């Protein structure tokens, strides 16, 4: 194992420098504050060798710490991932998308030729576009449920992020392109449906970031940003696709579907209160 530590302020420079210095047949890239549980790397290598997989996903633990330094984790289980052809890709990818593993590029093990192909194709690491391109090029994809990769959970309400919605739109566009490329094998439209639900989850996160983070944005600007997101063509497309299949999507689907900014704000605060008190919403 080569452990290569590179620091460079220029975007993408660390990744390319690290890859150029590496010698291994498998590549994993990660941040300094991310870590693997003991024996995880060897288990992932075993899976890669046993299955000839081009991509191996670990189980991901998204960790946050409270004021008492107690860890609270959301676990994305990779045990069920097994993709060997287009048919199994159409079956396996929707769960990969809905579970959130498709955005977890960090900590994933790639075969060296595949990783190099993604870099040479100009795909930016830590983007869904990088992952979807890799998935399309891969012959086999496996999950290693016994390997655990720890990463910091995203903090949606700490700081207002004005670029968040654009990022969600780009990620969904990459998933739409992936679904289009597999449309012949996906006669039931499962990938398209997963992409719509992915966009909905991202939109809800954007609304939470806008409404709950301390940002100093005026109520007028907040309403304008909210209306732009609710009236976006991609949002209306998602609402039409999920109107008969929105069970379990939570309090915000109704206000989003009716494009009511004030109701979205109210339901966002209500959902945050219910989450804090441990109440369940349908």
What do the predicted segments below correspond to?
Residues 30-32:
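Active-site acidic Asp-centered loop
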Residues 34, 52-53, 212-282:
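Membrane-interface aromatic/basic loop that binds lipid-linked glycans or pyrophosphate carriers
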Residues 189-208:
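Amphipathic alpha-helical protein-interaction segments enriched in hydrophobic
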Residues 27:
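Short aromatic/hydrophobic "clamp" motif used to bind/position activated sugar donors
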Residues 146-155, 160-187, 205, 209-236:
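Catalytic core of nucleotide-sugar-dependent glycosyltransferases
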Residues 1-5:
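Acidic donor-binding segment of Leloir-type glycosyltransferases
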Residues 11, 34-144, 152-164:
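Donor-binding/catalytic cores of nucleotide-activated saccharide
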Residues 6-22:
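Glycine-rich, basic loop-to-helix element that forms the pyrophosphate-binding segment
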